[in-house]
A protein has these predicted regions:
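Hydrophobic/aromatic beta-strand patches that form the interior of the parallel beta-sheet core
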Residues: 46, 75, 197-199
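Alpha-helix N-cap/helix-start capping motif
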Residues: 28, 79-80, 211
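Helical element adjacent to the flavin cofactor pocket in flavoenzyme catalytic cores
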Residues: 9-73
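Active-site substrate-recognition segment that forms the wall
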Residues: 52-55, 59, 68-195
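C-terminal lid/capping helical subdomain adjacent to the catalytic/cofactor pocket in oxidative enzymes
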Residues: 8, 191-239
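General small-molecule cofactor/ligand-binding pocket signal
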Residues: 2, 44-46, 170
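Active-site catalytic microenvironments for nucleophilic, acid-base chemistry
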Residues: 37, 41, 88, 216, ...
Length: 239
């Protein structure tokens, strides 16, 4: 371990090395590249607050603060915020949020060569373009409750336990992991409306499963044939 990561303090007895593990040093930059490609291929982006989903005869419609848009088919892929829309469609999906925290130490990415996870304490540290990112913890806290400052403090203390003295952290952030009781996402059509599709609830794996979920949903909308069994991911499983 010392040969791989000489800056980790020698508190450990051993570890597991994932030889082919990969990580993105700047996920936002990758997503912006994909977004630019989407626009170049004719995609349109409107930034508005969705207030409701209703219907114009049999076509789904999105109501915003100022406009109403009517579609042939519609996808709800709003992560942890999807439940607010599915509830309005009379579909009670037990989506909750696993809130996770991160703390950012600017200019310290040179201290580690790769992501390191300390499973006993439930946190990890990743070298990013912007510095060291310390992440971890899980709490079911919904969308409205304030952040738990104690969890941020624990991340800072754990990072110093692993790496020694660190400068004052630059940034704190809390995110919402969209989670379901069976740890499977919801992918596929609404049980009540055949022209509304769902893609959410990917828990800790949104970055990993987002691309394949998008491919599956686009195939459904285009009515392509598939040999995939998607029943385990249907919203029907919740009654």
């Amino acid at each position: 371990i010392h040969d791989l990561e000489p800056n980790i303090k020698p508190f450990y007895h051993g570890g597991v090395y994932y030889q082919y593990g990969r990580h993105a040093r700047n996920p936002k930059r990758i997503l912006l590249k994909l977004f630019d490609l989407f626009l170049k291929k004719g995609g349109k982006f409107l930034k508005m607050n969705v207030q409701d989903i209703n219907f114009d005869e049999d076509k789904p419609a999105i109501k915003t603060e100022t406009q109403r848009f009517i579609f042939d088919k519609l996808v709800i892929a709003c992560g942890a915020f999807s439940k607010r829309l599915t509830d309005n469609l009379d579909e009670k999906i037990p989506l909750d949020t696993e809130r996770g925290y991160h703390v950012h130490f600017k200019g310290c990415d040179h201290l580690l060569n790769r992501p390191v996870i300390f499973s006993n304490r439930g946190f990890g540290i990743t070298p990013m373009e912007q510095g060291l990112r310390v992440v971890g913890t899980v709490e079911f806290g919904g969308l409205e409750n304030p952040p738990s400052k104690g969890r941020v403090k624990n991340l800072i203390n754990n990072a110093k336990y692993m790496l020694g003295d660190l400068p004052e952290h630059e940034d704190e952030w809390m995110g919402f992991r969209p989670s379901l009781p069976d740890f499977l996402p919801v992918i596929g059509p609404s049980k009540n409306h055949k022209n509304i599709f769902y893609s959410f609830g990917h828990h800790h794996l949104g970055w990993t499963l987002g691309p394949i979920s998008g491919k599956i949903i686009s195939g459904m909308i285009a009515e392509e044939n598939t040999n995939l069994n998607l029943e385990p991911y249907s919203s029907k499983r919740f009654g």
